[in-house]
């Protein structure tokens, strides 16, 4: 499960889910054992993390949409993802 970014204790991962339940491009954000799945459109698909951190994740997704979509395209081709600048 490739880590594509980390900020404020949040780990952002993106991986290919063959036959998975989420049919849209998305990321997984983990914070202290809790996880939220967020589409690249910024919609929460599943789970939750503390509200303030979830807002940071959604903002980060919006800022980095193009890079995230490029990573998703790489995954679809079976290629390796690249890291994305964290929030500062």
List where the protein language model places each region:
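Broad hydrophobic/π-residue packing in well-ordered secondary structure
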Residues: 10-16, 37, 69-74
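Glycine-rich, flexible loop/turn motifs
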Residues: 3, 45, 80-83
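C-terminal structural segments of small proteins and small subunits
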Residues: 58-88
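A short, structured beta-strand/loop element
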Residues: 15-51
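Short, charged/polar N-terminal "headpieces" of proteins
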Residues: 1-23
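Intrinsically disordered, low-complexity boundary segments flanking structured domains
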Residues: 1-2, 25-27, 70-71
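Short, charged, low-complexity patches
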Residues: 50, 54-58
């Amino acid at each position: 499960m490739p880590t594509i970014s980390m900020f404020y204790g949040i780990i952002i991962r993106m991986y290919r889910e063959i036959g998975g339940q989420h049919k849209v491009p998305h990321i997984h954000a983990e914070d202290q054992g809790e996880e939220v799945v967020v589409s690249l459109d910024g919609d929460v698909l599943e789970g939750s993390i503390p509200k303030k951190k979830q807002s940071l994740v959604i903002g980060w997704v919006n800022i980095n949409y193009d890079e995230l979509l490029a990573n998703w395209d790489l995954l679809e081709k079976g290629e390796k993802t690249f890291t994305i600048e964290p929030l500062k």
